[in-house]
Every structure is written in C-alpha cells, then in structure tokens.
Regions:
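A short glycine-rich, Lys/Arg-flanked "PGG" loop and its adjoining helix->strand segment in the class I
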Residues: 127-139
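Acceptor-substrate binding/catalytic loop of class I
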Residues: 154-170
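Core SAM-dependent methyltransferase catalytic element
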Residues: 189-204
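A short acidic, Gly/Pro-enriched loop at the edge of an enzyme's catalytic core
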Residues: 100-112
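Conserved class I S-adenosyl-L-methionine
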Residues: 1-47, 151
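Class I SAM-dependent methyltransferase SAM/SAH-binding core
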Residues: 52, 58-101
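Conserved beta-strand signature within the Rossmann-like core of class I S-adenosyl-L-methionine
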Residues: 140-147
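A short SAM/SAH-binding and catalytic strip from SAM-dependent methyltransferases
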Residues: 110-125
C-alpha cells in the first residue's frame, strides 16, 4: 500500500504541475484521434451499467461517454483536473480518487475505461490496479485499456513522468491473471510516434 501511495504521489504531482498545459493540448474530444473515438464509442455502446473513467484527466472522455447516453463518472488523482472537468461539464460526476482506493462497491460497475491511465503503473503495481478494477466490475462487465505497445514493463521517459510499455500479449496475460477474458485488441503506429494498443476484456 505504501508503495502504491508513493507511485500515486509521483503521478499526481507530475500531472498537477502541467495540468493547464495538458488540458490545452489534450483536453478536448475534437483533439482526439478518430480511431480512438470510434474504439471507445463502440466499446461503451456494449456496456450495460455504470462506467468509471479511471484517470479521467480533463474529463473529455467521460463527457464523450455521457453524450453517447452512458451513465459515466470520472475519477483522477489530480485535484486540478477534477476542478476543471467539473467546471467544464457540471452535469457530470467527477471526483478526486485513485483506482486503488476509490471505494468502488464490489461488482457495482458495468465497465471501466482505463485509457492510457495505467501507463505510469510499475510492473509490480499494475496487477494490483487491474485487480481493483476487476473487483469493481460485475461478472460480465467490461474493461477497455489503452496503452503504449512495446517490451513488457520497459520504462520510457514520458513527458510528464516515467511510463511503461506493454505488449498486447503481456497486457493480455496481466488481464487474465486479474480475472478478465480478452475479447479483442488493436495496435497502430502513426507518424513515427510510439506504437499504441488497446484491449477490450470481460470480467469473468
């Protein structure tokens, strides 16, 4: 628990220092890739029940889900992100929390969206976060996780704070150990940037 609190503090402080800049660069759904919008939209349309947007940042993906008719809430470690999201989208529920200690009632969620919000988890910390997601999702509920595709657990210098690559196979194995069954995955590389990946899974 102490290790997770230390990691949470590292991520929180890193994003808090750049919250305004981050929101300007990435805080509008119109700035997001069409592929991401389609992927998340299709996934959300198949979720029955409440969706928790974990690491919601500026709140734009939570708003996207709500606009599609989903019952969605956003949580984030960074109070400035939550304050900004609540101001921009006052009709949506946002709160400051981490996945590890968000007090999600057991089996209360239809789905969890973890869109690049687990990339800063260490290889030792990731299983605990996936297990926390599984506890919150009822059997048959869904998880969608986005991440950077690469060698399993390899750290890289993300612009905010250290992040970690995972291969589709490696992340799939992590998900299966946490109590999920993988439904599908996708990968892509654009403009010479880091490779991206996502996995959709169901709680079993």
């Amino acid at each position: 628990m102490a290790q997770q609190e230390t990691e949470d503090a590292r991520v929180r402080d890193g994003y808090a220092a750049r919250a305004i800049e981050y929101t300007e660069l990435f805080g509008d759904i119109a700035q997001m890739d069409d592929v991401d919008r389609e992927r998340i939209g299709r996934w959300a349309d198949g979720v029955d029940g409440r969706i928790l947007d974990v690491g919601c940042g500026p709140g734009h993906w939570t708003a996207f889900l709500v606009e599609r008719g989903a019952d969605a809430e956003g949580i984030d470690l960074v109070p400035d992100f939550i304050a900004g999201a609540s101001a921009r989208f006052p009709h949506i529920s946002y709160r400051t929390a981490s996945l590890a200690d968000s007090d999600i009632p057991l089996g209360s969620l239809g789905g969890v969206l973890a869109w690049y919000s687990l990339i800063h988890a260490t290889p030792d910390g990731l299983p605990h976060l996936l297990e926390a997601a599984r506890r919150g999702i009822r059997e048959g509920g869904h998880l969608l996780v986005g991440f950077f595709d690469g060698a399993d657990g390899q750290p890289f210098p993300h612009a905010v704070t250290t992040a970690h690559y995972w291969s589709v196979l490696g992340m799939s194995n992590q998900l299966e150990r946490a109590g999920f069954s993988v439904l599908d995955s996708e990968t892509r590389v654009q403009d010479g940037r880091r490779a991206h990946a996502s996995i959709s899974a169901v709680a079993i």
